[in-house]
Each structure stands twice: as C-alpha cells, then as structure tokens.
C-alpha cells in the first residue's frame, strides 16, 4: 500500500520527562487461536505495515479480537503504557462547519484511502521501536512501520 511521503507527515511518539520504558509481561492466549493470529501477523508483514524488531525498550501485547462475520482475528495492540508516557497534542481540531465550508466546491477532498487511513502515514523512524509488540506463536518482536490505531495523537496526526 502506498504511503504518504515522510517529508509531508510522520507520526512521532515523544516521551514525557520522568517516564521510563516499560515492557508488558507476555499474555497467554488459547492455543486454538494461534494459527489465526499468525495468519493476521503474516498479512501485516506482507503488507509492509510491520517488521521484525531485534531490540525494544517499550514492548506491548497484542489483543486479538475475533471478527464475528468471518471468524478471522484482528490484532489490536495494548498501547496503554506508551500512551501514558506520550504528551497530548494540544493542537485544537477545527470546527466541523469551518471544515465543510473550506472543502465545498473542491473536486478532491482527501487523497487517503478510507480503508486503511492510519496505515498510510509512516511512523518516525526513531519511534518505530516504541511500537514493538510480542506475539504468541512467533519468536521475537515486531514493530509498526506505519501509524496504527490505538496510539496517542494518531487522530491528530491524521
């Protein structure tokens, strides 16, 4: 999937003073879902959304969510610890009426694919290791190359 240029936008994860990196203890899951988790992780690897990570100070766990219609697993990440350490982006969101007025009359309103909008914005290279997560059924760590849901200020970056 094509991403926006890093020169245009990157998602960053600055850390507030006084916070130390935290590695969440590994969670256990029902072994019956390991194959479906592995399938989803392979899909994310093939898409280029994640990559192997050899060392990380911040490690989060996955939260597998089963889709009711297909039975497939959607992999969410528990970013609570890194989100606590990240300052809130205080840039105010524009008022909806102003956005609508500015957009009216234009042919192109968005150049992002609505299907995987967050995944079209790169993570800042120096912050990718902060998105590291451990996954049952795999040996090692993975990190997000692109911005994903659940990260603090992702909505503001988008």
Q: What residue ranges belong to the model's regions?
A:
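Retroelement reverse transcriptase polymerase core
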Residues: 1-158
């Amino acid at each position: 999937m094509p991403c926006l240029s890093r020169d245009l936008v990157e998602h960053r994860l600055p850390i507030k003073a006084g916070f130390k990196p935290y590695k969440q203890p590994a969670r256990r899951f029902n072994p019956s879902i390991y194959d479906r988790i592995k399938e989803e992780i392979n899909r994310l690897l093939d898409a280029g959304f994640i990559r192997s990570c050899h060392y990380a100070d911040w490690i989060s766990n996955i939260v597998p969510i089963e889709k009711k219609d297909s039975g497939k697993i959607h992999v969410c990440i528990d970013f609570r610890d890194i989100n606590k350490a990240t300052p809130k982006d205080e840039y105010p969101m524009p008022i909806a009426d102003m956005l609508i007025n500015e957009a009216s009359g234009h042919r192109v309103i968005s150049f992002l694919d609505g299907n995987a909008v967050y995944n079209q914005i790169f993570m800042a290279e120096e912050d990718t290791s902060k998105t590291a997560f451990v996954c049952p059924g795999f040996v090692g760590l993975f990190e997000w190359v692109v911005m994903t849901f659940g990260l603090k200020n992702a909505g503001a970056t988008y």
